Amino acid sequence: MIPYHDLLERILSDGAEKHDRTGTGTLSVFGHQLRFDLAAGFPMLTTKRLPLKAIIHELLWFLQGDTNIKYLHDHGVTIWDEWADANGDLGPVYGAQWRSWPTADGRSIDQIAHVVDMIRRNPDSRRLIVTAWNPADVEKMALPPCHCLFQFYVANGRLSCQLYQRSADVFLGVPFNIASYALLTMMVAQVTGLKPGDFIHTLGDAHLYSNHLEQARLQLTRAPRALPAMAINPAVTDIFGFRYEDFTLHGYDPHPHIKAEVAV
């Protein structure tokens, strides 16, 4: 995960001081890209421990089209609690846009089902895109999508994915996002009969919050370890058929967790 450490170093050395919505303050750079070959290992950060259970359950929750935190709570995941209302609702966030994008004539579009079908039928298409950024719904969302658009690409029997993230909390959010979209790429590859290719992560405003700077410096003192391997139940052929038990991470030997507060 050297590319991630390079990003931390770039922000600490070149980042501009900026004010932000949360009032915390950031060091920020604009425009950065990370690339991971999924055949070389699962890109799960090793210089601090990440919560695999939360990563998997959040992704499954998105794929269900769910926007209430009850499913997450039922599985011990609390990462969305700060933004939910008293009933646990978040408004039309990621899952709603992925699975039921509203059209002007009252229909809805299941973008995930559509893109999987397109990969199978027309893998050379340049329209293999899913977007969560819906201008008509942004004001109704508890938190507008940070990772807002992703595109698939098929070549030589391998499926790659590029994510555009408009706002990137580099210490807390980005490691989580890398693992989540790498896993999604592997899942889509499996159900479409392809091998995983590259995951490319393109960042817009890539920032470290001012209360994460010391944690980032600590992390940079740690040497990256060998990447783990993700095993997925090969019997699953439906993108909506995956369960938590279908995923096993082998060889994950990270450095200890580094505590940092979420900016809300």
UniProtKB/Swiss-Prot annotation:
Query: Where along the chain is dUMP bound?
Result: 21, 126-127, 166-169, 177, 207-209
* Pathway(s) annotated for this protein in UniProt: Pyrimidine metabolism; dTTP biosynthesis
- As recorded in UniProt, its EC number(s) are 2.1.1.45
Reactions catalysed: dUMP + (6R)-5,10-methylene-5,6,7,8-tetrahydrofolate = 7,8-dihydrofolate + dTMP
Per the record, the GO terms for biological process are: dTMP biosynthetic process; dTTP biosynthetic process; methylation
What terms describe the molecular function in GO for this protein?
A: thymidylate synthase activity
Its GO CC terms? Answer: cytosol
**Catalytic residues (UniProt):** 146
List keywords of the entry alphabetically.
Answer: Cytoplasm, Methyltransferase, Nucleotide biosynthesis, Transferase
In which residues is (6R)-5,10-methylene-5,6,7,8-tetrahydrofolate bound? Answer: 169, 263
Compartment(s) of residence: Cytoplasm
Q: Which family does it belong to?
A: Belongs to the thymidylate synthase family. Bacterial-type ThyA subfamily.
* Oligomeric form and interacting partners: Homodimer.
Primary role: Catalyzes the reductive methylation of 2'-deoxyuridine-5'-monophosphate (dUMP) to 2'-deoxythymidine-5'-monophosphate (dTMP) while utilizing 5,10-methylenetetrahydrofolate (mTHF) as the methyl donor and reductant in the reaction, yielding dihydrofolate (DHF) as a by-product. This enzymatic reaction provides an intracellular de novo source of dTMP, an essential precursor for DNA biosynthesis.
Q: Which NCBIfam families match?
A: PRK01827.1-3, PRK01827.1-5, thym_sym
Q: What is this protein called?
A: Thymidylate synthase
